[in-house]
Amino acid sequence: MPAPQPPIESRDRILAAATALFAEHGYDGTTTRQIAAASGLNMATVNYHVGGKADLYREVMRLAHEAERAVVEGALAAFLRDAGADPAGAVAAFTDRYLDFCLEQPHVPALWMRRWLADAAEFADLEDRYARPLIESVRDTIVEILPGNSADEAELAVYTVLWTTHGFCRSAIRDQVPRFRAHLRRLVLKQLGLPEPSGQPGQTEPSEQRAQPQQPDVPAGIA
């Protein structure tokens, strides 16, 4: 008889399964029974470790937000450090880092894009709790460092990165990462009134070989 699964391992398996299913099918299109089957556990075990589907969804979104926040805060710190000497290069580096994150963790843009389609409408607080503070922190930093841009202009630039990157990462053209990266840089720099940086070093393309969209990856540490 197989030994019982340790509580942490079981919880991580449930979260990994739920993350993939919510990202691919949305909250409304996923059942607790599907999550239990995907995690290889029974429904009683799922309920014991994470509660109901609503509790599980909130935890999945919290983990996605924490991963995204860590990357955005790190990229903002680098932007603040470098923008004085090379504002265009700092902006390009920020967009590169966010694109890399979305390619490495495709479940994050997938989860948010599901919400854009009115999925999980009963969780209306998640945008204000998670997305809005990050958007405002990037917007306010742009206005502070690049004073030629109004708050409205800076916010639209942030949304440009968000919408285009999320859409690209869910598309069938993920073999075009270098082409899209260059396009995104040009687009955002033009929005912010900055020239393209000269001699921009080549970027490592962590996902260039992913020619077709894949099932969303699960958060690091819970697979």
Where do the language-model regions lie?
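Generic hydrophobic, amphipathic alpha-helix propensity
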Residues: 10-19, 35, 60-72, 138
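Helix-turn-helix
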Residues: 13, 21-55, 59
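Amphipathic alpha-helical interface segments
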Residues: 17, 21, 38, 164-171
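Hydrophobic alpha-helical connector segments
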Residues: 59, 74-104, 148-161
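Short acidic/histidine-centered micro-motifs embedded in hydrophobic/aromatic stretches
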Residues: 63, 111-115, 129, 160, ...
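Amphipathic alpha-helical packing segments from all-alpha helical-bundle domains
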Residues: 66-73, 89, 110, 120-146, ...
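C-terminal peripheral helix-coil segments that are non-catalytic and often amphipathic
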Residues: 100, 104, 132-144, 148, ...
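Amphipathic alpha-helical segments used for helix-helix packing
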Residues: 102-125, 171-175
